[in-house]
Amino acid sequence: MHTILLRAEGFTLYTYTVLLDMGLACGLILAWLEGRRLDHPGQALNAAFYTLCAGILGARTGYVLANWSYFSEHLPDAARLWKGGLSWYGGFLGGLVALTVYAAWPRRKTQPSFWLLADALTPGLVLGVACGWLACWMAGCAYGMPASGWPWLVWDLPDIYGVRDLRFATQPLGAALSLVAFVFLWTTRRRWSITGFSFLAGLILMGSTGYLLELTRGDDTLYWGSWRAGQWLSLVMAVAGAGLLAWRWARHRRDHHD
């Protein structure tokens, strides 16, 4: 783990910040490329920008709320983003609200639908999530619980407080699974005639992998019953994605048979 990438007189460049910025830049670039393929490059880029801003705000807010026992006594740390700490679920919900509002806002007759914009943004989102996991690996956030007896899945890693132990390699595993999901979405995006397929497939992939990763995490969070809040949210994401995809598929078949 290399928390600091570069340090000079009066200046410190954190690895977490660099990787996070790389993810954001990749997300915007891929949104523009997909928007151009779908004949709406400007709209896709605008949607990505607003979604990104709302997503960052939601991600930090979700992390602070999930760790309120700490931040209630260290409130200034809530604004210190470079130290690490973003909630994927808070970021997703914030971005989803922004995208929904943007798609519904009346602008022009050729305005793209929510589903088309969501398709354009999803590959970049998933690649950004991979960068986010790598950033957490460097900063120690979203760390795995202590474990043993799991070859290749248990590494000697620190938590966010710098305490090293044999832990589930949650962050590297999250990055790897996210990259696999990105490759699938990117290589198959031209094969599907259903608008919204990439977005909903992304929900299923991110929800199912998120649920599995939550089982390995050791960081503090909210619990709803005996499950981490992230487990519930991941399950809802995967089920909602599957249900909506089935609905879109049935509607697509009905429209083409009429």
Q: What kind of region is each of these model predictions?
A:
Residues M1-D258:
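A feature for loop-to-transmembrane-helix boundaries and adjacent hydrophobic helices
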